[in-house]
Curated annotation (Swiss-Prot):
Group of enzyme by EC: isomerase
InterPro entries for the chain: PsdUridine_synth_cat_dom_sf (IPR020103), PsdUridine_synth_N (IPR002501), tRNA_psdUridine_synth_TruB (IPR014780), TruB_C (IPR032819)
Function: Responsible for synthesis of pseudouridine from uracil-55 in the psi GC loop of transfer RNAs.
Catalysed reactions, semicolon-separated: uridine(55) in tRNA = pseudouridine(55) in tRNA
Family: Belongs to the pseudouridine synthase TruB family. Type 1 subfamily.
Keyword tags: Isomerase, tRNA processing
Source organism: Staphylococcus aureus (strain MSSA476)
Protein name: tRNA pseudouridine synthase B
SUPFAM superfamilies: Pseudouridine synthase
Alphabetized NCBIfam families for the sequence: TruB
GO molecular function, a single term: RNA binding
Length: 305
């Protein structure tokens, strides 16, 4: 039985669910879950939690993500990416803007911004996914959402051809960010229709492309009994949370028994959630949170016996 986090390289054409389904067959275990959907046409890093690591999948999902995308100015689509039908065209020429204009524009997207999720997305409105409305040619008001663009920059020259302009960007962002919506919004600010023509997720949950294995590589390593060496411990998925190392065996026992604590037992360091780590084994003991009605206390959220 495997336990740990496995960064998978999801190839284009597969859904995130396809990856989990195939892994369950390869590894012969059902206890597998991915940490955030990647659209079928998007390639890149998809961390997968296996065995007891499924208990930290939410925390891996909450960690930052990084993408490399190609923005295409001059044509918009129904899906905001290359898979959709053309909505609008407007010829773009090198006299319309230059790379300095693009760089200044990209700076304006840094920080907390508002996005309207695309119609072809799994965001739910009134209990129904937006893509279900879109497939039925129904329109519905889409709620604006705040997302965090931690960094964004151009990583290629501008390529003007066939009345369009194409360039690559790198984006570091929080969860829930739609890069294709970002591409269309870049076009709006330039005064042109636009879409995202290619996307690769280069980092997710602290895992990068070079860490990631294809399904074929995973199958081969499993057959050689050497896959466990490629898994990251579940503790890796909690590195975004503050932690305290516990030496006292009596306190360790209380933690593993799920007892409540007064915050002042830990110098009031705990603001929201805290990970308790065994000082001897470096293994996580539990995740605690501030008590919802007694702010001076902390209570267990997850205990790892």
């Amino acid at each position: 039985m495997y336990n740990g986090i496995l960064p998978v390289y999801k190839e284009r054409g597969l859904t995130s669910h396809d990856v989990v389904f195939k892994l369950r067959k390869i590894l012969k275990t059902k206890k597998i879950g991915h940490t955030g959907t990647l659209d079928p046409e998007v390639a890149g890093v998809l961390p997968v939690c296996i065995g007891n690591a499924t208990r930290v999948s939410d925390y891996v999902m909450d960690m930052g993500k990084a993408y490399e995308a190609t923005v295409s100015i001059g044509r918009s689509t129904t899906t905001e990416d290359q898979t959709g039908d053309t909505l609008e065209k407007k010829g773009v020429h090198s006299a319309d803007f230059n790379k300095d204009d693009i760089d200044r524009l990209l700076e304006s997207f840094k920080g907390i911004i508002e996005q309207i999720p695309p119609m072809y997305s799994s965001v739910k409105v009134n209990g129904k996914k937006l893509y279900e409305y879109a497939r039925n040619n129904e329109t519905v008001e889409r709620p604006k959402r705040k997302v965090n663009i931690k960094d964004i920059g151009r990583i290629s020259e501008l390529d003007f051809k066939e009345n369009e302009c194409h360039f690559k960007i790198r984006v570091i962002c929080g969860k829930g960010t739609y890069i294709r919506t970002l591409a269309t919004d870049i076009g709006v600010k330039l005064g042109f229709p636009a879409h995202m023509s290619k996307l690769t997720r280069i980092e997710s949950g602290g895992f990068v492309l070079k860490d990631s294995l294809t399904l074929e590589q995973i199958k081969e390593l499993h057959e050689q009994d050497s896959l466990q060496n490629k898994l990251f411990p579940l503790e890796y998925g909690l590195k975004g949370l503050p932690s305290i190392k516990i030496k006292d065996s009596h306190i360790k026992k209380r933690i593993l028994n799920g007892q409540k604590f007064n915050k002042n037992e830990f110098d009031n360091k705990i603001k929201d959630q805290i990970v308790f780590i065994d000082d001897d084994s470096e293994k996580v003991l539990a995740i605690y949170m501030v008590h919802p009605t007694k702010e001076s206390e902390i209570k267990p959220k997850k205990v790892f016996n």
